[in-house]
Regions:
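C-terminal effector/interaction modules appended to NTPase cores
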Residues: 1-105
Length: 105
């Protein structure tokens, strides 16, 4: 995936994972109440985040055109492996204007 990142976030892992999340990790993200999508994580100034760690970085989503206008600054989305929540990502900046909620802009 060679696209630019869609969002900048603060990652918070909850200790559920057994191993650190390495740069390039591709979990699912609960974008809306009923839409999970894959996204690629890149972490600033670190190669991996511990299972209960936090980091700032970016997410590049697989198919942002499928869930337009669904994100806003401050929204907290689940990071999941299947149905298991392994952490959260809080949106701090939206680079892809297609994703920016018109109601909360």
């Amino acid at each position: 995936m060679n696209r630019k990142p869609d969002v900048e976030v603060v990652f918070e892992f909850n200790g559920t994972r057994m191993n650190p999340a390495a740069d390039g990790y591709r979990p699912a993200h609960l974008i809306t109440d009923n839409y999970l999508t894959t996204g690629v994580h890149h972490y600033y100034q670190m190669n991996a985040v511990p299972p209960n760690g936090t980091a700032k970085g970016t997410i590049t989503f697989l198919s942002p055109e499928a869930y337009p206008h669904s994100l806003w600054i401050g929204k907290k989305i689940n990071i999941q492996e299947g149905d298991r929540i392994v952490g959260y990502a809080t949106i701090v900046k939206i680079f892809n204007s297609l994703l920016c909620s018109e109601d909360r802009a």
